[in-house]
Amino acid sequence: MQEFSLWCDFIERDFLENDFLKLINKGAICGATSNPSLFCEAITKSAFYQDEIAKLKGKKAKEIYETLALKDILQASSALMPLYEKNPNNGYISLEIDPFLEDDAIKSIDEAKRLFKTLNRPNVMIKVPASTSGFEVISALAQASIPINVTLVFSPKIAGEIAQILAKEAQKRAVISVFVSRFDKEIDPLVPKNLQAQSGIINATECYYQISQHANKLISTLFASTGVKSNSLAKDYYIKALCFKNSINTAPLEALNAYLLDPNTEYQTPLKIAEIEAFKKELKTHNIDLENTAQKLLKEGLIAFKQSFEKLLKSF
């Protein structure tokens, strides 16, 4: 399935030096993503950073973070570079800008350009959240020929608006990261069993349709947050359900490994628009509106990344 790509949503130094290379070499993945929460988890809990942190003592916390994070990003970039050179639609690693800059477009643009210039790798994507100021940042980076990963996309309306900007302005590869499982975690406790474990996939499918209206060879939907939040679901539930043409799925290791044991051999056919609308109508009988939920989840996602980043900086 050449039009579906699997990426790894995990970063940690020991992993990059070992299992990450194995996954690439056996053709299991062709890209990777990182975020502030993943870096916080890796750097604060892994022993592989401690010697370097000790040597950096006395420097500012953000400087320590960037030294560690950029080293990991460069290592991932090098490992993925042969894939990028073979096919420039694949082989990317993503790095997110400082989450505390999300409401300041000018500072976000400056930081994104600085990080991209410092890394100096064509297969690095700069992650920009789909916040209010994010639109200006996305436009500026697209015009500057910087590969972009627009993250924390929950709303189909926002997904379509972002795709429209990128279709006009993107000169390099761009992905729109549609978050999936958080919808089910939010909505499932509020609905009967026959409606559970569906909201995330249905909302993501509507986002996919919105993006597809503007997608070209540079722009793809990337399904993110595809690890299950419920023990009742198969670990690879969201990967299998969203195996669409011209899409990418970035998955945590547990979901990734489960999927690789029994991967899809054919693309999934997305639900029809009429089926999506019927489901949304049924949700409304339970006083649930997916667009309102999307706005809530975006706010929570922005806060969560700030909290993780703050926790990481304080650990230094």
Curated annotation (Swiss-Prot):
Identification of the protein by name: Transaldolase
Gene name of the encoded protein: tal
Record bears the keyword Cytoplasm: yes
Active site: K127 (schiff-base intermediate with substrate)
Family, similarity comment: Belongs to the transaldolase family. Type 2 subfamily.
Keywords (A to Z) from UniProt: Cytoplasm, Pentose shunt, Schiff base, Transferase
Function per UniProt: Transaldolase is important for the balance of metabolites in the pentose-phosphate pathway.
Catalytic activity: D-sedoheptulose 7-phosphate + D-glyceraldehyde 3-phosphate = D-erythrose 4-phosphate + beta-D-fructose 6-phosphate
One GO term describing the cellular component: cytoplasm
Organism: Helicobacter pylori (strain P12)
UniProt main location, coarse: cytoplasm
